[in-house]
């Protein structure tokens, strides 16, 4: 986040997957094996006040870097999403939706003392109440079989094919980011991810013809991002990504997922001081 103030640019859309503050020493299951839920020191809670201050600080920076008609998406669970929503409201954002991402393949609850955690939340907000944000309503209706898309999305968690260059502990699935990008941006729009991780947002942006800037502090994940970006130079892999994304779109307008040469770009150039 230290770099963000030095970026002399405003983005059409921001997707943020900030720390959830859920690394508490617990265990979960992945591929049939017990694993720790700890993601790293960056995901450990520093206490309510410090966690809340952190969310407010980065959300304030992001609001400065958002175009007047741009929108921001922020993912989370009950561990952090209420703090994010409060900070958004206090900073002047207008929350449009709280998307419930229902995973159809969640890990089981090992303790058997409460309901299985199978959802995450994604807040979608515009810069202010008076902003005229972009929403591709017709496309969302089309990929939902001709009916209005609701705010509960049933999509799988990260699949094996998305781990070809390694696995980030909180990596988001490509179909999820693709839907978000298609819903709220146009081709050649600029997208920012201030917690880029392994750059699923960047991969989806590239595949769908958008411009992207990602910020990430961990060298390991930067290398993973570069490897994933390099993969896209293989036209067969890029075509495979389109096909996999299209499986989650019940539509006859499949040309939105066809591999094609990018349109000439005559838009804004990004500057980093």
Model-derived regions: residue spans:
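Core catalytic lobe of class I
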Residues: 1-224, 261, 270-273
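S-adenosyl-L-methionine
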Residues: 1-5, 226-267
């Amino acid at each position: 986040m230290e770099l963000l103030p030095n970026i002399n640019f405003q983005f059409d859309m921001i997707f943020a997957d900030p720390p959830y503050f859920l690394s508490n020493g617990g265990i979960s299951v992945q591929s049939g094996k017990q694993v720790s839920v700890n993601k790293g020191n960056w995901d450990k809670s520093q206490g309510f006040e410090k966690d809340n201050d952190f969310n407010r600080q980065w959300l304030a920076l992001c609001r400065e870097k958002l175009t007047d008609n741009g929108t921001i998406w922020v993912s989370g669970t009950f561990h952090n999403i209420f703090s994010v929503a409060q900070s958004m409201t206090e900073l002047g954002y207008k929350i449009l939706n709280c998307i419930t991402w229902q995973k159809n393949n969640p890990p089981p609850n090992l303790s058997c003392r409460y309901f299985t955690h199978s959802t995450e939340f994604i807040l979608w907000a515009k810069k202010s109440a008076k902003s005229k944000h972009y929403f591709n309503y017709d496309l969302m209706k089309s990929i939902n079989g001709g009916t209005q898309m609701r705010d509960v999305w049933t999509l799988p968690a990260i699949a094996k094919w998305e781990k070809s260059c390694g696995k980030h502990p909180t990596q988001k699935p490509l179909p999820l980011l693709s839907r978000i990008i298609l819903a709220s941006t146009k081709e050649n729009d600029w997208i920012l991810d201030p917690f880029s991780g392994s750059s699923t947002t960047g991969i989806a942006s590239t595949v769908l013809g958008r411009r992207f800037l990602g910020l990430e502090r961990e060298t390991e994940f930067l290398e993973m991002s570069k490897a994933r970006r390099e993969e896209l130079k293989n036209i067969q892999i890029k075509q495979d990504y389109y096909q996999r994304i299209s499986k989650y779109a019940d539509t006859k307008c499949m040309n939105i997922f066809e591999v094609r040469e990018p349109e000439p770009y005559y838009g804004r150039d990004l500057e980093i001081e």
